[in-house]
From Swiss-Prot:
It comes from Streptococcus equi subsp. zooepidemicus (strain H70). Keywords: Cell cycle, Cell division, Chromosome partition, Cytoplasm. Component of a cohesin-like complex composed of ScpA, ScpB and the Smc homodimer, in which ScpA and ScpB bind to the head domain of Smc. The presence of the three proteins is required for the association of the complex with DNA. Belongs to the ScpA family. InterPro entries: ScpA, ScpA-like_C. This is Segregation and condensation protein A. The keyword Transferase does not apply. Pfam families: SMC_ScpA (PF02616).
Amino acid sequence: MDIKVKDFEGPLDLLLHLVSKYEVDVYQVPIVEVIEQYLAYIETLQTMRLELAGEYMLMASQLMLIKSRRLLPKLVDKEPDEEDLEQELLGKIEEYSRFKALSQELASQHDKRALLFSKPKQELIFEQAVLQKDKTVMDLFLAFSQLMAAKQEAFKYNHTVIERDDYRIEDMMELIEARLELEQELTLTDLLKHCDHLNEAITLFLASLELIKRQLVGIEQTSHFGQIVLRKEIQ
């Protein structure tokens, strides 16, 4: 099965998405938490063997440096370049945020002009609409990466060898649909709670994405960092 996850426009776009969930000024966000979420997302992509641009890995290495310096015991006064690295990162995120807002405003103005003159919309507008549509799926993916980060320790101590074909996406789709028939709604946490193997969790997640793609299952997240809820769609 060919799985394609809608990507962010770059590492700064991913960081901006994570920072914006806190709904505070960019310089007030808990930077270590944001870094951990970014690294969990990257690790999940690698585990699922999805393509990852080099710029994401470069940013990951820079973030790990900032995180390690933040967590080291403060035996000496903070080095000047330590503060500079963090402030430079936050400055880049803030600058990117302004750039993205301006781009969206320009796209909106272009859309309005296109309607007035009855001209076909350019590809940029359609591409932007697709990005907006996929945001809920990306939130699901980010939530999954956080759950996987929490379960890594358990998976590490389970050495049972599982063949790839032992877990089939089609079977997991049927399992999810059967549970939704009984329970009406299901959180992503509950869905993955009893997974003992990494392949099992990944296959369940991919099955969820396929059900969402086919519009058989809907998802809802009522608040930032809240539970992801899966519900059966009414046909």
